[in-house]
């Protein structure tokens, strides 16, 4: 649509930042909004597909540099609703903000299940599978729906688990799954 084209034009004309060797637009990048757009819009603009790939690659590069899983999105956390920015509107990278506050917070980011499933549906990589296994070992049984996520900590006994089961998480997981099923049948 013209609206999504305008957003992409603005994003790609804003300059670039480099994070762990991956170039990203210097525009506000949140995983939920990006992947919802990719999975829900028909006839995706190639720039949207490229942007999703760059965001994925930046997560993998972050892991390769730090050995810590991240799957930046937005949602519940142990300190309230948060926004995990891959890139903030002013060009900072890998920043977490509590909703309603205009400053960054220092906390282990939540590895959001919905973002991990998005990575799996699009790329089915070893990195995405390993992150999914990490969450599977950390979270409650998904028989009533998938929990939001958990932070990264080698010691499972002190991981901050976000056990809430919500429509935003499960809706994006379903959209990612449907996208993967449809894409594999093409």
For the regions a language model picked out, list residue spans one by one:
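Ser/Thr/Asn(+Pro)-rich, low-complexity disordered segments
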Residues: 1-186
């Amino acid at each position: 649509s013209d609206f999504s084209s305008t957003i992409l034009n603005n994003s790609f004309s804003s300059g670039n930042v480099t994070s762990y060797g991956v170039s990203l637009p210097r525009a506000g990048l949140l995983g939920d909004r990006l992947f919802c757009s990719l999975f829900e819009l028909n006839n995706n603009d190639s720039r949207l597909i490229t942007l999703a790939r760059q965001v994925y690659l930046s997560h993998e590069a972050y892991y390769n540099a730090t050995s810590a899983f991240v799957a930046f999105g937005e949602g519940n956390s142990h300190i309230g609703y948060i926004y995990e920015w891959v890139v903030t509107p002013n060009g900072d990278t890998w920043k977490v903000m509590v909703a309603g506050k205009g400053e960054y917070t220092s906390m282990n980011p939540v590895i959001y299940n919905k973002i991990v499933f998005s990575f799996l549906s699009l790329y089915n990589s070893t990195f995405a599978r390993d992150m999914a296994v990490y969450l599977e070992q950390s979270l409650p049984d998904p028989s009533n729906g998938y929990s939001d996520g958990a932070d990264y900590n080698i010691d499972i006994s002190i991981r901050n688990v976000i056990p809430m089961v919500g429509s935003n998480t499960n809706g994006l997981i379903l959209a990612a799954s449907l996208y993967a099923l449809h894409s594999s049948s093409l």
